């Protein structure tokens, strides 16, 4: 006779199962388990008197015979493709199984073999997501990497050379010399990295040189002059060399209006940064570009979500980042032209509709590198409160909304930048870049961050204590982030042209270099759960935003979850 236990007791022991629901942190977002891949009665769990013991849940299978290096037991996976309970097997730094772990000699339905060489990570009672991907990094200081990792980000892409004036304003690593130095600096940083060259040139030679030197993309920024000529030249080089182009358009409309930029793009794939416009771009209507099928639109997190403080903090941020002088009226007018409550409010709704596809940070250049995931789910919460359930959801859960928003910081930036074969989702064959969260701290404080199959960051107590848990407990780097363990766990993304020129040997790099690919064929339709193409217009007098004729407006949030309740200092 099978032994029956209550649903509550089961969830407390093995984690929630099909039909169970839970709240994410202090938000109004409710998650419901769609499927459980484990087998009732044959679940695996580690510990004294538990299942993963020799001859029980642990087989005699050696690593060479198929046993995994690590098993994450009973994890609740939240990814764009589903919300499921499963065991996850890791081997050689990759995800090799999502299903039922254990001993096939004694248990039913085993798809992930646990052996004497298998380490166990307890996933029961935890949410498992793919490591976050931030594709709008100003590499101003190396301390950003630890801050990002502590928030659940495992891949950072952008540009910069340190606290140079150009880097403070623009996401570019200009020229072969600086690209080489940044690729060498990446050797000691425990995340995947990729660097954008400067895309502002009207002829191709200097752009091609940067791509051959190791740039994985090119960035067009108005502070360097984003004219129709530079847009066309940059995209032409990108099409030939298969790298992505990111663009910060012309706020002042000096070289043309948004229609002229769209014409210069000529239907080619492009990633538009801070597409609402407060971070920069054609004033007041760059936001309409999100309705173009070839445009991959993203937001940066200072406008996520729209709150009572958003407008006030932006002016000073903008003046500092873009080297403006508050004593010059024209500089102040430039800054003020970018900050519009109407377009920021509309941005919230366009994210909820799936018309904006990606959220990134704009680190130390009007954005906060450690708040990408937090701001993403604050936006989801605000939209749930203000707009109610999505049509695809029900009164029981917000599953579709949760999948839509997790896609904005995982799979969609990976697809946009040609790295989705390696990272961006919890799928077999991909790098084991994974984040475990306690549900009560989801989106604000990861419990464990796994990078390439090794733990690189975790909540940890006093190192002199007799057990791991006495306070002060806070996030700390772990063994996977040190020594020669770091290089095999991380990827450096470059161009195919750089791989052909043997950039790894030329620069003496130990990390694996990986070429981005298929960046020019991806369109908005490829972006998961965020491919809506509304016809967007902006009233030039009032700045009101309309999508398919409907006014998009919402009130600023007065209070947000994932905020001071969790961050007292």
From Swiss-Prot:
Subunit structure: Heterotrimer of UreA (gamma), UreB (beta) and UreC (alpha) subunits. Three heterotrimers associate to form the active enzyme.
Active site: 322
Binding of substrate, residues: 221
Record Pfam families: Amidohydro_1, Urease_alpha
Main location: cytoplasm
The organism's taxonomic lineage, starting at the top: Bacteria, Bacillati, Cyanobacteriota, Cyanophyceae, Synechococcales
Class of the enzyme per the UniProt entry, highest EC level: hydrolase
Reactions this protein catalyses: urea + 2 H2O + H(+) = hydrogencarbonate + 2 NH4(+)
Similarity section: Belongs to the metallo-dependent hydrolases superfamily. Urease alpha subunit family.
InterPro entries: Amidohydro-rel, Metal-dep_hydrolase_composite, Metal_Hydrolase, Urease_alpha_N_dom, Urease_alpha_subunit, Urease_AS, Urease_asu, Urease_asu_c
PTM sites of type N6-carboxylysine: 219
Location of the protein in the cell: Cytoplasm
GO biological process: urea catabolic process
Entry binding sites for Ni(2+) 2: 219, 248, 274
Post-translational modification: Carboxylation allows a single lysine to coordinate two nickel ions.
Species this protein is from: Synechococcus sp. (strain WH7805)
Name this protein carries in UniProt: Urease subunit alpha
Free-text cofactor note: Binds 2 nickel ions per subunit.
Keywords: Cytoplasm, Hydrolase, Metal-binding, Nickel
Temperature and thermostability: Optimum temperature is 45 degrees Celsius.
């Amino acid at each position: 006779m099978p032994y029956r236990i209550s649903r509550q007791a089961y969830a407390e022991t093995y984690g929630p199962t099909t039909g169970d629901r839970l709240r994410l942190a202090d938000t109004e977002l409710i998650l419901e388990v769609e499927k459980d891949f484990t087998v009732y009665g044959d679940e695996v769990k580690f510990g004294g008197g538990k299942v993963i013991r020799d001859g029980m849940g642990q087989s005699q299978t050696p690593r060479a015979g198929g046993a995994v290096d690590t098993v994450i037991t009973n994890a609740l996976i939240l990814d764009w493709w589903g919300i499921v309970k499963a065991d996850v097997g890791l081997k050689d730094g990759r995800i090799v199984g999502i299903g039922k772990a254990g001993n096939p000699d004694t248990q039913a339905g085993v798809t992930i073999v646990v052996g004497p060489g298998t380490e166990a990570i307890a996933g029961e009672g935890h949410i498992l997501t793919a490591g976050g991907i931030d594709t709008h990094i100003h590499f101003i200081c190396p301390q950003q990497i630890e801050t990002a990792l502590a928030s659940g980000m495992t891949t950072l892409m952008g540009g910069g050379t340190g606290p140079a004036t150009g880097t403070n304003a623009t996401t570019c690593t200009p020229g072969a010399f600086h690209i080489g130095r940044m690729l060498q600096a990446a050797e000691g940083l425990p995340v995947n990295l990729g660097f954008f060259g400067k895309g502002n040139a009207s002829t191709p030679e200097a752009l091609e040189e940067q791509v051959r030197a190791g740039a994985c993309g090119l960035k067009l920024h108005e502070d360097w002059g984003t004219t129709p000529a530079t847009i066309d030249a940059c995209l032409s080089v990108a099409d030939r060399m298969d790298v992505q182009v990111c663009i910060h358009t012309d706020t002042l409309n000096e070289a043309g209006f948004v229609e002229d930029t769209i014409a210069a793009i000529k239907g080619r794939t492009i990633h538009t940064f801070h597409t609402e416009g407060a971070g920069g771009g054609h004033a007041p209507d760059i936001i309409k570009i999100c309705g173009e099928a070839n445009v991959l639109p993203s937001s940066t997190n200072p406008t996520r979500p729209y709150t009572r403080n958003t407008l006030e903090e932006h002016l000073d941020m903008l003046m500092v980042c873009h080297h403006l002088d508050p004593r010059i009226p024209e500089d102040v007018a430039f800054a003020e032209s970018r900050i519009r409550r109407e377009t920021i409010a509309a941005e919230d709704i366009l994210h909820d509709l799936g018309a904006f596809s990606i959220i990134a940070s704009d680190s130390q250049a009007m954005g906060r590198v450690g708040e990408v995931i937090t701001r993403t789910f604050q936006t989801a919460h605000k939209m749930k409160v203000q707009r109610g359930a999505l049509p695809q959801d029900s009164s029981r859960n917000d599953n579709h909304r949760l999948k839509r928003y997790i896609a904005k910081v995982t799979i969609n930036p990976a697809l946009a930048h040609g790295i989705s074969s390696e990272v961006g989702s919890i799928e077999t064959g991909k790098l084991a870049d994974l984040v475990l969260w306690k549900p009560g701290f989801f989106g604000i404080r990861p419990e464990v961050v796994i990078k390439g199959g090794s733990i690189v960051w975790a909540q940890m107590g006093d190192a002199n204590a007799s057990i791991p848990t006495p306070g002060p407990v806070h996030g700390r780097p772990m063994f996977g982030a040190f020594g020669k363990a770091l290089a095999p766990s991380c990827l450096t993304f470059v161009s195919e042209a750089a791989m052909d020129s043997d950039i790894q040997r030329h620069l003496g790099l130990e990390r694996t270099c990986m070429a981005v690919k298929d960046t020019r064929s991806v369109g908005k339709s490829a972006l998961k759960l965020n491919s809506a193409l509304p016809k967007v217009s902006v009233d030039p007098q009032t700045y009101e935003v309309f999508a398919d004729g409907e006014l998009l407006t919402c009130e600023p949030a007065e209070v947000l979850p994932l905020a001071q309740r969790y961050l007292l200092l």
